[in-house]
Amino acid sequence: MDRLEVFQNELALIAEPEIRELTEFALKSAEAKFFVAPASSSGKYHTVDSRTVGTMEGLNNIIVPGGLVHHTKDVVKLAHEGIPKLFCADDLMIAEKSAIICASILHDITKYGIPCRIHTIAEHGELAARWLEKIAEDKLSALGEHWSTVPNIIIEGIALHMGRWAPSKNKPTLETTGLIHEADYWASRKFIKIER
């Protein structure tokens, strides 16, 4: 599996091509550790399968996903199927739904820092948002020309996905980014099992 194949099902949920392109670009640009690292470096948080370590094998770097990928898939599933229904947010525009899936896929993309470290870093949400703004400034600007709220949903959704548990303690200000925060919270609970 390559980087995009790992998230093939999740990328298919992004109905807007420009938002899917941004997400794919970010996945291709991410540190390799994102694809093979456990979701929790301490083992204190997340489900058992989210604490696994994956590998990159062979000359073609075939990916056997780690726990962070499993956690990310769980967040996407909750953000797409569960959390919007719980909060009566089924009336979102297609672009907003696509932005939520994009942010859900990318929310932990720099969880181990840039360059990667041994342990996760507390401010990884803010770091991921700044990283995406830096590497994809032109793509985010183009999205803003079509949909004024989409770049904010993506950037705030990534930056504030931890809410009060982040060092900044800043909570999401938009309903849409609150959905990402809720999905991440519930996906990280040890007692929750999400079918993939």
Predicted regions and their residues:
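Acidic/His-rich, divalent-metal-binding segments that scaffold phosphate/diphosphate chemistry
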Residues: 1-116
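Divalent metal-dependent catalytic cores for phosphoryl transfer on phosphate-bearing substrates
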Residues: 55-64, 70-71, 82-196
